[in-house]
């Protein structure tokens, strides 16, 4: 059973990791609303499903109760189970909710590291929510475990056992400044969201479990 659960978590992580890495900014509409365009249409459809008790808005800036239109709801309910599994994230949690223990978070961190880790991914609240959603649906972690120390400088996880820290980085001039996505790329969203105005990126190196930051 453990092997089967690990396989399911691995398959789900591929989809969530893809969303973490592939979401890019879309063009700004005449009224200034920032839209999201996923490099894969299926990923965008997946993100709209969200949690079992709510769905993500198209902007993914916050969780709302029901952003889907009547036709979209009908389309989702008529999908075959196999198709739904192939296309998007689980609509319902796969395990019971619990407060993650130290061992849970250690195992979770090493699992993510083995699957490619979070290194090189710009931090944003949207991406934090995606990681939270994966932990909730596949591992049963109650929301609220992902918290970091304040800046400036390196942000360490407050929850003992989670081994990924956030490092401030300099924004490189590159694709993030392209006309089609510069307003929503995480390298620019992060300074707007961060009280210190820093651009943060998850570190690819796990911190030592005994490291405790106050």
UniProtKB/Swiss-Prot annotation:
Disordered: annotated segments: 27-48
Keywords, ordered alphabetically: Host cell membrane, Host membrane, Host-virus interaction, Lipoprotein, Membrane, Myristate, Viral immunoevasion, Virulence
UniProt GO cellular component terms: host cell plasma membrane; membrane
The keyword Nuclease is annotated on this UniProt entry: no
Oxidoreductase listed as a keyword: no
Chain positions covered by the region annotation Mediates dimerization: 129-145
Protein family per UniProt: Belongs to the lentivirus primate group Nef protein family.
Protein name (record): Protein Nef
């Amino acid at each position: 059973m453990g092997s089967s659960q690990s396989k399911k978590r691995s398959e789900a992580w591929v989809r969530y990791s893809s969303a973490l890495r592939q979401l890019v900014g879309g063009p700004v509409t005449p009224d200034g609303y920032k839209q999201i365009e996923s490099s894969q249409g299926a990923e965008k459809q997946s993100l709209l499903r969200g949690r079992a008790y709510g769905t993500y808005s198209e902007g993914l800036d916050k969780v709302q109760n029901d952003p889907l239109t009547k036709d979209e709801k009908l389309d989702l309910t008529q999908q075959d189970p196999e198709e739904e599994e192939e296309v998007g994230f689980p609509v319902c949690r796969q395990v019971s909710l619990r407060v993650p223990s130290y061992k849970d978070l250690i195992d979770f961190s090493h699992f993510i590291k083995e699957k490619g880790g979070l290194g090189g991914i710009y931090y944003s609240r949207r991406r934090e929510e995606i990681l939270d959603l994966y932990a909730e649906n596949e591992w049963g972690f109650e929301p609220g475990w992902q918290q970091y120390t304040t800046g400036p400088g390196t942000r360490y996880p407050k929850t003992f056992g989670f081994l990924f820290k956030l490092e401030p980085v300099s924004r490189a001039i590159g694709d993030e400044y392209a006309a089609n996505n510069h307003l929503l790329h995480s390298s620019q969203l992060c300074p707007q969201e961060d009280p210190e105005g820093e651009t943060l990126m998850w570190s690819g190196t796990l911190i030592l479990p005994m490291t405790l930051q106050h």
